């Protein structure tokens, strides 16, 4: 995976989408993964249809999709959708570890800076 796009030691892959769902960049497990991009866009479109009476004054800032071995962190900034697939554990010197990290993705082409905090248990 491109070292400039690696935002966490436990990162498995990433997608960068335009707000209309078109794939701009990808890497790792998500390299050219149009299917995942379509599923994520469907999920984001679903969040737009939440009844205001059910959740007044709420806006979704980040979505996390949690699986046993990994999770996806999805956020939007400057009309771009950033998706990162992260392993719940990673190995260092052959030992499986848990970690707490703060991550930042810099999109040099657009001057965007996406940050998130991750705690792994």
From Swiss-Prot:
Annotated source species: Drosophila pseudoobscura pseudoobscura (Fruit fly)
GO biological process: cellular response to amino acid stimulus; positive regulation of TOR signaling; protein localization to lysosome; regulation of cell size
Subunit structure: Part of the Ragulator complex.
Cellular compartments annotated: Lysosome
Predominant location: other
GO cellular component: a single term: Ragulator complex
Superkingdom of the organism of origin: Eukaryota
Family annotation (InterPro entries): LAMTOR4
Residue span of region Disordered: 91-121
Functional summary from the UniProt entry: Regulator of the TOR pathway, a signaling cascade that promotes cell growth in response to growth factors, energy levels, and amino acids. As part of the Ragulator complex, may activate the TOR signaling cascade in response to amino acids.
Protein name (record): Ragulator complex protein LAMTOR4 homolog
Listed GO MF terms: guanyl-nucleotide exchange factor activity
